[in-house]
Each structure stands twice: as structure tokens, then as C-alpha cells.
From Swiss-Prot:
UniProt-listed Pfam families: FBPase (PF00316), FBPase_C (PF18913)
Species assigned in the record: Chlorobium luteolum (strain DSM 273 / BCRC 81028 / 2530) (Pelodictyon luteolum)
Record-given protein name: Fructose-1,6-bisphosphatase class 1
Pathway the protein contributes to: Carbohydrate biosynthesis; Calvin cycle
GO biological process, one term: fructose 1,6-bisphosphate metabolic process
Keywords: Calvin cycle, Carbohydrate metabolism, Cytoplasm, Hydrolase, Magnesium, Metal-binding
EC number: 3.1.3.11
Cross-referenced HAMAP family: FBPase_class1 (MF_01855)
Organism taxonomic ancestry: Bacteria, Pseudomonadati, Chlorobiota, Chlorobiia, Chlorobiales
Family to which this protein belongs: Belongs to the FBPase class 1 family.
Residues reported in the UniProt entry to bind Mg(2+) 2: D113, D116, E278
Oligomeric form and interacting partners: Homotetramer.
CDD domains membership: FBPase (cd00354)
Length: 333
């Protein structure tokens, strides 16, 4: 690009299109970008310092916690929570809500997965941070409660993710398109690299953990058989691309087209992915880029949450590909 545009400048430029904007979202997203820089610094050094491996505890999901998970969680809470812009926060790693300092001046709720795919960090596979921002409903921020977090995904005012891979990329939306920024370590800034991202209407890749095939329902099994069949007219067979890091799989499919499927299984009949920390923010981004995201029956952003750590199946990606997967899940095909 002929002109270097930082994420802060880009957000400010976008803000000019909305005279009623207060600038709060600019500050919020700048805080997230700063926290991402801190996490990135440790991710790239993870093999050199003692933050690999397990911490010897389990999180609220019943999963063994990685040391880097805890580090990322603490860094994000401390870096973002100290400025008084958030009244309440929720993390995949914390059982309950988090009340940050100076919360009485905050107007927003932050929900986040500090380090998605962290089980892969030991083998140098991409990991990421996923975040979601809501405006609180409480009239008194000092008394913000879990109900301020339990909002439908359609109520999000911003969402995004940071992927830590061969390069570090931050992607976000405020409901007016999707934009991506690549981190330049020589100047310490996220620079605009993917403006107005639109996902292809269909793709040629599918992402699913086929190791769970025996636990899939008949609809999912028939869907997998279908996309593996030879049919040039419909672009089949599709090719499998599955990293095992949600944010990395989603990012690839967002740019190249395709579908990510995490269906219900006999082990996890309500799905395994977290609605508030993973499905909602990625669904917001996907829809803004022209894609589709459902639980196989309902639009993800229309689900009314009842729990902070609620789980859901997820079908997300290119519009046409998600619709086909849904039809098999619903028994239409």
C-alpha cells in the first residue's frame, strides 16, 4: 500500500462517517490492540521462557489450563480493565464475571477468549484472541451485572480477533464492514492490510474434526459423504483444511471461502464452542463480510443466552456452503 494507516487512524477515519460517534469505540479498540501486542510479545517468546505446558489447574470448562492461557488472560484484564471504559468483563478462563477497576465510569461489557487454540502453541501452530464488545444495559455502571453480558450477539457494537501466526493480524468490525491489520514489529503498530474484507459466496474447503465422526449424527455424516463426492458441476469434492485452532481455521475460510463446522456430538449434544466468547464475535464478523453463521437451525446472533459459558454448535463461513450444511443438519437433504 502507498500509505501506511494504523488501526487507530483507521478507526478515527471511520468515525467521521458517524457524526453522533463519541470516540469511545476508538479508545476501546485501541485498548484491545495494545493488549494484543503484549500477548504477541510472549507468544513469540513462548519456547524461550517458562510459559509453555500446563499450569496444573483446570478452567471453568473443565479443561487443563496452559500457562500461556493464564498469562494472556491476566495481561488482557490488566491492560484493558484499568482505564475505566469497561463496566464489566467476562473471560473463557474465569468462572464468573470480572469487575475491573474504575468500572463505575464504564459503559461497555467485554467478553473474550484470551488464547484460542492454546493447546497448539507447543508445536508452533497459530493461536488467537477473540473478543466481543456490548454496551451495558444497566443505568448504573457501578452495579453492572451478568445480565449486561448475557445479550444476544445482534447487540454487539464491536467484535474481532487477533491471530498470532507467521504474522500477527487483527481483524475487527463495528457493524460497518470488516477490516484487517497486520502488526509491523519494526514500528510496533497494526497497519491496515485488508480493507473491507468480503468472504466469497462459496468456497472449496471444509473444516471439521473428522476424528469425532463416530459421534456425529446422521445429518452430519451424510453431509461429509456429500462434500467428498465427485461432482464438477457443484465444485465437489471439497478439500479438508482443519488446524484445530478455531481462529486460524475461521480466518483462512473468511479470506478464501469455505465452511467451518463444529456440529453437536453424542459427547457434546449442545455443541462444544462457547456462544459468548467464540461463536457470537465470529458470527458478527462473518455476517459483516457477507457470510453466514448458525447453530444448524438458528442464526447465531439471534440466540438469547442464559449462561456466561453457554455452548453451541457452529456452522460458519461462505453463505452457500453454510446453507448446504444446514440442510443436512435439518434433514432437508
Amino acid at each position: 500500500m502507498s500509505q501506511l494507516i494504523t488501526i487507530e487512524r483507521h478507526i478515527l477515519e471511520q468515525q467521521k462517517n458517524f457524526p453522533e460517534a463519541t470516540g469511545e469505540l476508538t479508545d476501546l479498540l485501541s485498548d484491545v490492540a495494545f493488549a494484543a501486542k503484549l500477548v504477541r510479545r510472549e507468544v513469540v517468546r513462548a519456547g524461550l521462557v517458562d510459559i509453555l505446558g500446563f499450569a496444573g489447574s483446570t478452567n471453568v470448562q473443565g479443561e487443563e489450563v496452559k500457562k500461556l492461557d493464564l498469562f494472556a488472560n491476566d495481561k488482557i484484564i490488566n491492560a484493558i480493565g484499568q482505564h475505566g471504559r469497561f463496566a464489566i468483563m467476562g473471560s473463557e478462563e474465569n468462572e464468573g464475571i470480572i469487575i475491573p477497576p474504575k468500572n463505575e465510569t464504564g459503559s461497555y461489557a467485554l467478553l473474550f477468549d484470551p488464547l484460542d487454540g492454546s493447546s497448539n502453541i507447543d508445536v508452533n501452530v497459530s493461536v488467537g484472541t477473540i473478543f466481543s464488545i456490548y454496551r451495558i444495559k444497566s443505568s448504573d455502571p457501578g452495579n453492572a451485572s451478568i445480565s449486561d453480558c448475557l445479550q444476544k450477539g445482534s447487540e454487539q457494537v464491536a467484535a474481532g480477533y487477533v491471530i498470532y501466526g507467521s504474522s500477527v493480524v487483527m481483524v475487527y468490525t463495528t457493524g460497518h464492514g470488516v477490516h484487517g491489520f497486520t502488526y509491523d514489529p519494526t514500528i510496533g503498530e497494526f497497519l491496515l492490510s485488508h480493507e473491507n474484507i468480503t468472504t466469497p459466496g462459496s468456497g472449496k474447503y471444509y473444516s471439521i474434526n473428522e476424528g469425532s465422526y463416530a459421534q456425529f449424527n446422521d445429518g452430519t455424516k451424510r453431509y461429509l459423504d456429500y462434500i467428498k463426492e465427485e461432482d464438477p458441476a457443484t465444485g465437489r469434492p471439497y478439500s479438508t483444511r482443519y488446524i484445530g485452532s478455531l481462529v486460524a481455521d475461521f480466518h483462512r475460510n473468511l479470506l478464501t471461502g469455505g465452511v467451518f463446522v463444529y456440529p453437536p456430538t453424542t459427547k457434546h449434544p449442545s455443541g462444544k464452542l462457547r456462544l459468548m466468547y467464540e461463536a457470537n464475535p465470529l458470527a458478527f464478523i462473518c455476517e459483516q463480510a457477507g457470510g453466514r453463521a448458525t447453530d444448524g437451525h438458528r442464526r447465531i446472533l439471534d440466540i438469547d443466552p442464559s449462561e456466561l459459558h453457554q455452548r453451541t454448535p457452529l456452522y460458519i463461513g461462505s453463505m452457500a456452503d453454510v446453507k448446504v450444511a444446514e440442510e443436512f443438519e435439518q434433514g432437508i437433504r
